[in-house]
Amino acid sequence: MDRQLKNFILKGGRLIDSASGLDGQQDIHVRDGLVTEIGADLKADGATVVNVKDCVVTPGLIDVHLHLMNGLGAFGVDPDIFGIGSGVTTVVDAGSAGHSLLTVFRNYVTRTAKTRVLNYINLSTLGGVTGPGYSILADPRLIDEEKIEKAVETNRDIIVGIKIIATGGALGAEGLKPLARARKLGDNLKIPLLVHIGESWNKDAAPVHVGDVLKYLRAGDIVTHMFTAHPGGLLDPNGKLWPQVRNAKENGVLMDVGHGLHNLNFDVARKVLDQQLFPDGVSTDGHRGNRAGPVYDLPTTMAKLMALGFSLNQVVEMATVNAAKLLGRTAELGFIRVGRPADISVLRLEEREWKAVDSQKGTMQARQALVPVYAIRNKTVYEPLPVERP
């Protein structure tokens, strides 16, 4: 049940705010949608007490990669399912809309969602209309720089970058030309590229070498699906990182998990992590086809990274302050501050064994689970939607 509360205190929780270095028991007082006080054992003084004892309180979680145009193709899902319904306050659509659909997206998704929704605009005019496996960049006419630039300038408040699928299936006969065009657009508009790697759909297409993709990326650009087992990933046939990957990371290219239905493989993840290449962000690549598994939600994806060796503090940092950096939104997201609108997630850390499943049905024994308890935006305290998590 969602509650509208004018004056309330989150009482007794462990606050982890990586942006300010806070980690300890702290109460948070919210009045009229703004954080008014943070401190140990605050007095209620007439405020409604929301008991979060034995819970982890964080800045609002940010899921930086989803497909959120409900009813569009095979993927589109209501943003509030992976958003406030999963303890997450900000979600980012990864290219459902090209320039031609962006106004529709804004009117019917962004404005109607209870969750904050941001966008990567698709390089292709088609966006996500066709669904996966189609050559949405194979015809040069499917990229219209002038209209993309106009759409971005009109929607700067929600656009965080340009999405491009760098696979043989998507690029088709155009080869690497769309990447060159995306690079120029990103430079002109001063926004990053979000690049999908891994040929997970069109098995007949020749894979694009990740080294060729990385030639077009600069500091602040993002590679998503860093743990994919599909052709075009970060590892060579011997399980070693391609040298271009290390160079790109050292030069500021960012790496995102992008779990998805196909692109988190535990064996690949272990090999990548063993070579000291770590994710900058954690995301679900959530859509209609993976809510019931293997993805479930962002807290479950964070818990899978914990099973791979990351600490609670590290995954919280990835999903808050690091996510805000990926999006270029550090002035408004990823922290809790007095005087700022309440944007808060509450999770329960459960010490129990459960079987984590990757995108290829590989399993791993996990010993800690993260379960959403609340997502708080301004005056509203949202409870999570029911879902059968592992």
Which residues fall in each region the model found?
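Histidine-rich, glycine-flanked metal-binding segment
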Residues: 1-9, 13-58
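Divalent metal-coordination and catalytic microenvironments
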Residues: 13, 28, 33, 54, ...
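Metal-associated gating/positioning segment near the N- to mid-region
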Residues: 44, 52-112
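Hydrophobic faces of well-ordered beta-strands that scaffold small-molecule active sites
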Residues: 60-66, 91-93, 117-121, 160-163, ...
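Metal-cofactor-binding active-site regions of metalloenzymes
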Residues: 86-92, 96-97, 112-140, 163-170
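Histidine/acidic residue-rich metal-binding segments in metalloenzymes
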Residues: 104, 143-255, 263-280
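His/Asp/Glu-enriched, well-ordered alpha-helical/loop segment
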Residues: 268-349
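C-terminal cap of metal-dependent C-N hydrolases
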Residues: 341-390
